[in-house]
Amino acid sequence: MAPSLGSGSTRILLIVSLLLCLRQQAVVDAAIVEHTFHVGNLTVERLGQRQVITAVNGQFPGPKVEARNGDTLLVRVVNNSPYNITIHWHGVLQRLSAWADGPAMVTQCPILPGSGAGSSYTYRFNVTGQEGTLWWHAHVSFLRATVYGALLIRPRPGVPYPFPAPHAEHTLLLGEWWNASATLVDVERQAFLTGGQPANSVALTINGMPGLSHAHKEMHHLRVARGNTYLLRLVNAALNYQLFFKVAAHNFTVVAVDACYTDPYHTDVIVIAPGQTVDALMHAGAAPGRRYYVAAQVYQSIANATYSATARALLRYDDDAKDAAKTIIMSPRMPVLNDSATAQRFYGSLTGLLRDGKPTVPQRVDTRMVVTYGLAIAPCLPAQTLCNRTRGSLAASMNNVSFQLPATMSLLEASRSRSSGVYTRDFPDRPPVMFDFTNAAAVNRNMSLMVTSKGTRVKALRYNETVEVVLQNTAVLGTENHPLHLHGFNFYVLAQGTGNYYYLIRKKKIRKNLVNPQQRNTIAVPPGGWAVIRFTADNPGVWLMHCHLEAHLPFGLAMAFDVQDGPTPDAMLPPPPNDYPPC
């Protein structure tokens, strides 16, 4: 007798059949997205000056890459520029594709200039399980000042956003601009030779335009229809500055950060650090008969800093007056440049959106680390010919290790080939000495706390190990907000605040959010403060964690995690592709 429709065996068969159908449908829905990036020189004019920059496909900013959750991307990069180049896919998890992550001398050697061997490389990676706004950028020298673009990952066909569907969207890339007499590579080179800070940019940009002229010639324009709701996709591609972002007479609902959905957060100002992205809904319902400035302004977390800049774009309604000369333009009221209270209120108010079937915070912790970081002083290198050898060279460190990139082989290649002499697996779990990290007066009286040494030391992790890291900012040579980016993973932000973490934890003044913390790939650790992050090391490879203030990476404000293979083939990193760039 055949089993009834309600029997256990039939239900199991139906469930298995349904799962197979869903899996097959997901495969059908997934696509292969292909692009070719030609990197080369481009002459542009900004602020009344013609300048040669490095760009992709003759565009600044570079081309927008669009995909859907589950797609595979193949991006062939051809280097026609005079410089070594790599491309990093910022925020892409690179599951089992660490060879495509992109940081020079970490996961690959650079793509060489010219037309010979090693002058092109195809980045191959999948974006299953990711949705939202990410971006791509050069990961060599200061080239990312002009070599960058948006990477948008939409839900699978037929899958809605977990927020009200917008009528349309605008992608806004926020950047910096140098009117350099030489090139940006020379700006970094000069800083290296002197052992000091690089020259400041002269302007901020929105989609490559500074928007400083009242004639609006060099200004990005946004068109909106009254009554519609728009998804603003914001990317901070600036090299060295966090930014306040506002639109005059408009408010936002933040729905995602770093391509991770959040609970809706209502605000009139967005704070965004270099490397971070924000997705926010904006309703176009302002008063008619006006136009509205969109503004991105420097947020200075350094005490006594005076440098400020603002970029502007222009928001126009479809029904505004045709006579622009008679139209009132409204400007947003921006925070003061050092308004850390507004910054921390924004960052501290975000929580993660809980969704059925999606990962939650790992409750067990296998490894706990305390990573202190900040600026430091190191002896001048022989090649630093303009460095003051009495004073020393400006440096930076994590747990008093100033990270040095290898010169002959990438860290990932060295790890996989078990090559010796390239790096060591002994990055410390704690700083060499515990002190009152944020007491500037005490710290800067102790010269021993300012001196660091170079090293290429990484932290080895077992596959699937859960790691909790206390990121403690220090007051050595000043306090500022360092945005730290972790490659290869999203992490949960369990808590963040100002002061000395260990003093506060002893006083039981810290409460970790283990229910719905925000997820990120880049965290702006508060000036003179700390953050607690947690992630699971379920992605084999070598993954950089570094400050996304571009000047601080060559100073040494970085470290790396070397994650071992898992026990099964689907948890093991495949060999490098055939066109993997040689050193």
Curated annotation (Swiss-Prot):
Cu cation 2 binds at residues 90, 137, 548. It holds the Pfam family Cu-oxidase. This is Laccase-14. NCBIfam families: laccase (TIGR03389). Residues 38-158, 168-320, 426-567 form the Plastocyanin-like domain. Keywords: Apoplast, Copper, Glycoprotein, Lignin degradation, Metal-binding, Oxidoreductase, Repeat, Secreted, Signal. One of its GO terms (molecular function) is oxidoreductase activity. GO terms for biological process: lignin catabolic process. One of its GO terms (cellular component) is apoplast. Glycans are attached at residues 41, 84, 126, 179, 251, 304, 338, 388, 400, 446, 464. Its cofactor is Cu cation. Residues 1-30 form the signal peptide. It comes from the Eukaryota. Cu cation 1 binds at residues 88, 485. Binds 4 Cu cations per monomer. Belongs to the multicopper oxidase family. Gene3D superfamilies: Cupredoxins - blue copper proteins. It catalyses: 4 hydroquinone + O2 = 4 benzosemiquinone + 2 H2O. It is found in: Secreted, Extracellular space, Apoplast. It comes from Oryza sativa subsp. japonica (Rice). Cu cation 3 binds at residues 139, 487, 546. Its EC number is 1.10.3.2.
